[in-house]
Structure formats: C-alpha cells, structure tokens
Amino acid sequence: NNYLNANVSAEMKIIDGLSLKGVVGADVINDTRFTRNNAVAYYASEDATTPRPVNLANNKSSNWNSDAYLINTQLLLNYNKTFGKHTVSGLLGVTNESYTYTANEIEKKYVDPDLGIATDTTTGEAGNITGKTSVDDTNRTSLTSFLGRVGYSYADKYYGEFSFRYDGSSKFHKDYRWGFFPSVSLGWRLSEENFMDFYKEKVGDLKLRTSFGILGSQAIGTYDRFTTYTVYDNNYAYGNSVVSGTGFALGLNDLTWEKTKTFNIGVDASFFKNQLNVTFDYFYKRTTDILMKPIVPSVFGTDMPMDNIGEMQNQGWEIGINYNVRTGQVQHGFSFNLSDSYNKVLTYPGHEQITKVNELERIIREGVPLNSYYGYKTDGYFQSYEEIEASAIPVGGKVQPGDVKFVDRNNDGVIDSKDRYILGNAFPRYTFGFTYNLSWKGLDFSMFWQGV
C-alpha cells in the first residue's frame, strides 16, 4: 500500500487588505495485493494412511490493483480592512474537488500450491486455465463550488455576515446539478451599549445572536441516477421454463440536492469577571427533498431508485454553564450542559415504510420521529384458560396460561398487524453532561458524567 500527500500554495498581496491565494492538494493511494487460497489435505485419524478428499473448487490465486486520486484546487480572493470602528471582510473563490478510483482484479482457479500456476483438478497437470475471472471498477466524481462571504462589524458591538455557496456535483444530471446555498448571521453585543455600562462593570458580558441558512447534501452513490446492469446471469421463471437474464438497478435522472433550512437564536452571557459563562441556543431545522430509496415488495422484481422524497423537521434547545475560579494554588471549575431535541417526519408521499433491524420493526410515518419503533403493546400475562377464551389472541397461535397478553388495539377480537403501536424511537429527548476539574500544585483530578 502506497500513500502520497502533497500540498502547494501561493499567496499574493494585491493592495493593502486584499490578497489572492491559490492552493493545490493531492492524495494518491495505490493498493496492490496478491493472494492464494489452497485447500490442505488432512487425515481422519493419526493411523490413517489415506487423506480425506479435498475440495479444490475454492483453490485460486488473485492479483488486485487499485489507484485512487483526490485532487483539490482552490483560488481565493480575501479582503480584510478596518476603518476606525468599522471592520469589513470579504471572500470570493472557486474550488474543485475531483476523485478518481480505478481497480482491477485477475483471478485464476485451481492453483498449484507451490508455483501459483493454473492446474487441472483431475490430472494435476499445469496449463488448464479455464477457471478464470477478471473484475474492473471505476469511480469518478467532481464537485465544483463558487463561494463568497461578506462580513461587517462596528465598534465590536454589531456584527453581520452573509455567505453563499453555488455547488455543482457530477452525481446529478446537468439540468439538476447546481444548487445555491446562502446563509446570514447577525450579532449584537448588548453589554457594549452605553445604557449597559453598569451591567458591564458590575456583572459581565451579554451578546445576542441569530443565524439562518440553507445547506445542501449530495449523499448518494456516484451513479445512482443511472439505470445500471450487473455482469452476471440471473435466472428467473417465465411460465413453465427457467430463462436467463441480467440483473439491473433502476436510476432516476432528475435527482437533485437534498436541502436543509436551519434557524438558530442564542444568548452568550458572562458573570463575575468571566468566571461564570452561560450560553443558550434554540435551533430549528427543516429538511426537504430527502435523498432516500423507497421500499417496495419483492414481487416488484428490483429495488426502487434513489429519489428526492420526504420532508422532516428537527428542533430543540441547549444550555451550557461553565464556571472556573482560582484561589491561591487551587484552581477548580465545572461545566454543565443540558439539551432537548425532537424530530418528526412531515411528509412521506405515497406510503409508510416498515423495515426490520435486529428483530425490531421501525417505521417511517408522517407525524412521528424518523424510524420509530413499531410493534405490539403488552397487558401482562394470561392467568387462566378462561381468560384466554375471553381475550383476543394472535391469529393461528396457540396460547396457554403464562403467555404474554397483547393489547387488541382495534377491538376486533384477534391480534394481528393492525394492532401495532408506535412504541418509541432511538432519539432521547433530554441529554446532559457534567465535568468537574480540580488542580493543586501539579496534581489534577477530574470527573465526567453524561446521561439521557
């Protein structure tokens, strides 16, 4: 395995506060492997004179070679200038990230254990190379981005920034390749106002901030928009005959970016000459055009293609408290954080989706958290046959005293798939963490707690 990383950059000052910078980086990875699998003869017992028959079907040698190239180029125009109490900053740039991966493997079966050459499984004579295969793999992606940012601050009191990205991904068709993703943020250091002089002098610092932006995701396979065919025979029933065919995976040409709108508002406050710091954030996210693959019954014959379907939201809040104090040679402090978040599926066109993972069924359903646990509620245990006769039981099941009693949700007298409930989800509502640190004359003590 060979790995090479190289970076080259150059920067030129145009005028005071304005500079141009270029960066080129490369990662080159080469992987070469030669392997041999050989069956080993063994004897049934210590006294046996004839070895057991050896299955030579898995005897083979293979030669694997792969090359990966990641090239990153950037051209950035930076500006930063202060005029009295005014500070202006800006950035314009274009970037490209290109990835190329090629691999091939040649494999021959029935290899000689010593020489690694092809042999006949019956006679052991060299020269039979009928059992051979070759594999080729290619993966190429490219992401080009035009980006910009403008920032302004006044007297270390008011802050504002606008930024954008205009991204084009080779994973999408040329008509749907580009996405525009802007963001804006504002800040106000309230403690710098004249009417807050008493607060600043006696209490500490106070800052309000908010932001809004749109993020994009291209989390799909390189060729998911294409209908692809596999290079193997796939036999299937056609009437009373078995015929051969070729496996395929459907593609969708109008795939485009998944988009997430984010909103945040927060407060930063400090007390007792910055010994105590408190932060609070509220966030809201709404994701649209989610890139996912719908689940269909196996009778459809193949998987559905990746698609922009569904919409969901995530919202919550977080508070953090940090306190540090030093008394002589003793320094100690703690930090505490508590957060709450909740997500739910807003739209999932066409149908619900139920999947089974490690014996647990999960469901995507509008109005509930993503991949909620889905199943039956219990109501204790059956105590007698009389209770069993008077209760709903699973269809086709045999029940006896001591078995679990399930809730008949729709009161139809039987327990079936219509009696399932949303049982919960894998996302805890509340999470917390606590850290304490103590140091004295080179001795340190710390502890960390977290939970949900």
Residue spans for each PLM region:
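Residues embedded in well-ordered regular secondary structure
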Residues: 10-13, 386-403
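Aromatic-residue-lined binding/catalytic grooves and analogous aromatic/hydrophobic interfacial grooves
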Residues: 234, 384, 434
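Glycine-rich, charged/polar anion/phosphate-binding loops
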Residues: 249, 359-363, 419-423, 429-434
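Extracellular/periplasmic, surface-exposed regions of secreted and cell-surface proteins
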Residues: 1-37, 48-375, 438
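Acidic carboxylate motifs that coordinate Ca2+ or other divalent cations, activating on Asp/Glu
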Residues: 412, 416
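Acidic, divalent-cation-chelating loop motifs in proteins
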Residues: 406-410
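Glycine-rich, aromatic-lined ligand/substrate-binding cores of catalytic
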Residues: 423-452
